[in-house]
Amino acid sequence: MNGEGVSQCAVERPAATRRQFLKTVAAGLGASAVLGRPVSAVLAAPQQASPARLPTALVGGRICKSHAAVNRLECPERYDAVLAALRESSYFSALKHFRPRPASDDEIRLCHRDTYLATIRRDIESGAPKLTSGDTFICRNSLLAALFASGAACVAVDAVLSGQAKNAFCLTRPPGHHATAERGMGFCIFNNVAIAARYAQQKHQVGKVLIVDWDVHHGNGTQEIFYEDGSIFYFSAHQAPWYPGTGSKEETGRGKGLGTTLNCPVARGAGREEVFAAFQHQLAPAVDRFKPELVFVSAGFDSRHGDPLGRLELTDRDYFDLTGLVLEMADQYADGRVVSVLEGGYDLTGLGSAAAAHCDRLQQG
């Protein structure tokens, strides 16, 4: 990927229209409601004219491969696998490419403490093989890659909120949703989605933000950072019991954030039925109450069947349809504005095909 912009004209939408898509999803669920409303009501609603189509932004670059710590799973080849799958897709030329930039220290401080940033720099300068604050492996270029990963998410926010793109996918690493305010863990250094959410609020005056996390692992860092914040709603559908051991149904927020954390743990072996039920019956009504102005996806593809770090059974088609459900929610309340950021996914072939299915649905809008 060379970072050059491509044509801003999206490819023609396939025959599977929004209306057909809703019917397909509803049939697959065996349910009579989508997003908390009867399908008949959704389909009977007047169809408004769509604005001029905008492209999906693809934000990322080879700089993220410079984080090449001794880790055979969260490896630079993850970037290559996703990029190769996207390049082989029929829609790659319709994506608009944006160059990432490093996040500033002030942007990192939106979610992380100065002491943690100092710890990272000290650990890297000392040549330590992993962060002393957790189990994340590092190398001499890890800080640079992590700064670009967080900065890429901010670039995506700018692209979507300025009207340069309808939505965005950040092809970056290391992932971020396990990183807390003062600790890196679970392959994560900085919490990319959390930083971008705060950035959207501070720079673009966005009010309410929804974060949808479908990684097989619970995003303990994201939950912790926003646990007492009523302006950011965190939803996670994840395997339990599983690493990192957080994310029970009883964890719903605290203080002003009470009711803005929603965890839907599913058992080992769960697949489409269980995960889609969580989206339809738990998330959709919550979104109707919360009414977000911007939506983020912590897009972890280790919930795909066959992933070495997960035991769920989602398929590429499931990610395509889950993306459609998120887009429908964003259409209702956030003018369709969605920023997706890569999290986990460690079977290279499966990661590539799942991410490509996700981006396919994003670019269809």
Give the location of each predicted region.
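HDAC/HDAC-like amidohydrolase catalytic core signature
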Residues: 2, 8-365
